[in-house]
């Protein structure tokens, strides 16, 4: 869960007893400190109308994707942030657990300097460690669209930099 205003990701563990649900528990296991971000004041324009789109900021998008690599576990997460001037970008995280609890292994904000808003992402990692981020794009000159970008497993790890260029899926 994104904790807007405190630059934290709150981690919860849920243990469900399907036979006796009163034995089920929800436990807050950690708060992970992120790089500073703001999710306020995002205005997503679209051509031909003054009607703006909701940035859905302040919450993680979709569900966190989980992968077990035997020697460590990974969860991928993302949410929308204000990258300046009310423009939206996608903040993404690779969370890792090597056996001593979850930590932020790498994080980054995808927001090329082209005036476009990027928000409402969905992020995942494959069995090779490649990361793909799909997201919505819009501006006063670009109709709402879908694009992807990513990070190859060959990229310098832990830096939060995408080395797979943005590609349009639907314009």
Model-derived regions: residue spans:
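C-terminal PAP-associated
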Residues: 1-171
């Amino acid at each position: 869960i994104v904790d807007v205003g405190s630059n934290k990701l709150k981690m919860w563990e849920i243990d469900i007893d399907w036979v006796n649900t009163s034995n089920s528990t929800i436990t807050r296991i950690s708060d992970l400190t992120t790089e500073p971000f703001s999710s306020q004041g995002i205005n997503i324009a679209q051509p031909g109308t003054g009607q703006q789109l909701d940035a859905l900021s302040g919450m993680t998008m979709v569900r966190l994707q989980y992968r077990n690599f035997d020697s460590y576990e990974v969860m991928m997460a993302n949410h929308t942030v204000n990258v300046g001037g009310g423009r939206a970008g996608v903040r993404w995280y690779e969370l890792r657990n090597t056996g001593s609890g979850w930590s932020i292994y790498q994080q980054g904000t995808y927001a090329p300097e082209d005036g476009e808003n990027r928000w409402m992402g969905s992020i995942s990692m494959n069995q090779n460690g490649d990361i793909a981020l799909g997201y919505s794009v819009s501006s006063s000159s670009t109709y709402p669209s879908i694009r992807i970008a990513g990070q190859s497993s060959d990229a310098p790890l832990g830096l939060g930099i995408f080395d797979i260029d943005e590609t349009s899926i639907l314009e």
